[in-house]
Amino acid sequence: MINCVNESTLSWCNDKGENMTLTHQISRRLALALVASASLFSSVSIAAADKIKVAAIYTLPVEQQWISRIHKALNSAADRGDIEYTFSENVANTDYERVMREYAEQGQQLIVGEVFGLERAARKVAKDYQDTAFLMGSSFGGVGPNFSVFDNWIHEPSYLSGMIAGAMTKSNKIGMVGGYAIPEVNRLMHAFMDGARDVNPDVKFMVNFIDSWYDPPKAKESAFAMMDAGADIMYAERFGVSDAAVERGIKAIGNVIDTSGDYPGTILASALWHMEATIDKAISNVVSGNFEASDYGQYSFMAYGGGSLVMDESLVPADVASSVKAKQQEILDGLFRVNVNDARPQSDG
């Protein structure tokens, strides 16, 4: 029960989040006395309602590109005073379930993380702590009553970045280096390939996965091999690819974060992920008592501000930039839908 009061009436929210009002007039002193008494039996104080406790569990450092987007959004919420935020990073899959339970036992109201490598164990924890809200990056759906899922559905800006690459390649060969061939990665790569092919039917792709989320030397080595085979633009799904592009003097397309400042003159464009819309919706649902099992993936769409394209117009020709902006508007207006393909992408030829 969340209590609130003004001078003439007593209002409160019941456990279902419904607004309740005492209809007869009462004195300020009586109102305050009633609130003080009710607060003894209330599980959530006014202060706690304004600032909920949120914990995040990351399997990689918070600097890693995908993780950094979640961490940034949660820090923004903390800076606004909406949440008390704590986190654990570099948590091994073997320790993940234990850390989830520890945070739940501590009374964290919302636990955020990514459970691609331990789907079954994570759902078991959520079932054991049904008063805790869980929001997890996952390849599968949510499960009631309290386990929701999300992912970086930035296939739309990925398609747009593919248009740029397809229009600008001179060799008609584009290299693509990914981490793991999982649906979350595959759909972005396919969207990029579709965008490139739609403006350049002759383009061919070389695709490789390094089977790691963070191995820049291995990604760099794979990129060099593709460049040696004629690729003149690289899709940098993982760190290390853009470093190779800089060394060889070719262009690259970024993913999830904007690294153009780190690689000036190299990054043509990047498909960016903004986790704020997802996090803010989850926080709002927890505060209102409306959090339930659902898929928050839609909040990564461009229409919700969860995805965007950034391009370096000093590197991208004006006519190409104009075409991309027009297609972006079609997406935002609901006139063009980017295809979603979760299958493992393959090299051409």
Question: Can you annotate each of these PLM segments?
Answer:
Residues 74, 160-203, 207, 295-316:
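An alpha-beta-alpha
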Residues 127-152, 256-266:
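Flexible loop/hinge segments that line or gate small-molecule binding clefts
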Residues 53-73, 77-80, 86-96, 116, ...:
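Extracytoplasmic "Venus flytrap"
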Residues 142-166, 176-181, 264-277:
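Short beta-strand elements at the ligand-binding edges of bilobed clamshell
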Residues 27-32:
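N-terminal export leaders
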Residues 56, 108-115, 135-137, 229-239, ...:
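Periplasmic-binding protein-like
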Residues 81-90, 200-213:
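Short beta-strand elements in bilobed, periplasmic/extracellular small-molecule ligand-binding domains
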Residues 287-349:
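Hinge/cleft segment of the Venus flytrap/periplasmic-binding protein
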